[in-house]
Amino acid sequence: NNPVNYIDPDGMDWYEANNKEIIWTNYTSQKDLDDNKIEGKYLGQAHVVFSGSRDERLGKKNGKNGYIDGEGAITANVTLYGPRGADDITTMTGFTMTSNVNKYGAITEGLFNANYDVNGKSGILKSNWVLNHRKEIPTMDNKPNQSPYAGENYGKPIKTGIFIHSTNSSGYAGGTVSTGCLLLAPQDFQTFNKIMSGVRNFTVRLTKEQTIIVPFPLAVFIGHEPFIRLTTIRR
């Protein structure tokens, strides 16, 4: 990627309206929105939404578990709002709960600043797209980071060095493919790189659907199950 191939020559960016709609605008900062009485959150030259679930899981392929495109996989829907206009919107397949959430944990839901990192990610699965300049991102539910790869973050409710990168070329995402990072299917990551060429700063919205089971005290009187499933979107 060449970070200077494309630098928003028309001066237009994205913002999130109060109704959560993502809109292309000729305002290029939060101050511009505020000064012009536009209610919403400035998002930047590009914006990525990972719409995931706390129940995400990798699937089975060729008799082996751990694939983003495997049978039974529950994945995240990813929407990339690109830098080239209101119609520059692409949907992709992603994964937000790491290769083994019980072992590595995951990052929290929220809106994060992100950027093109010139040095890029180490290891086989290269990437230059990182959240918060490699700095701290809270863990899901503020749980202590007990990943064996946590380093100085061990026991703290944070992760650092959170990139957006591809699974293996086969779609395999198990093992140590992600101990915290956000994943895209391999072909989608290639598309992501092309669309994002020239972008230096952007934002990432991570949402996760969560189903909570709560007791239902009146169940015995009306023949209902003794609990109710409540589904919420954490963002």
Regions found by a protein language model. Give the residues of each.
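Composition- and surface-driven signal marking solvent-exposed, interaction-prone regions
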Residues: 9-12, 193-198
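Glycine-centered flexibility sites
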Residues: 8-11, 105, 110, 180
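Short, solvent-exposed mixed-charge patches
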Residues: 213-216, 233-235
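Well-ordered beta-strand positions
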Residues: 15-16, 183
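Cell wall/extracellular polymer interaction/catalysis modules
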Residues: 16-175, 200-202, 206-210, 216-217, ...
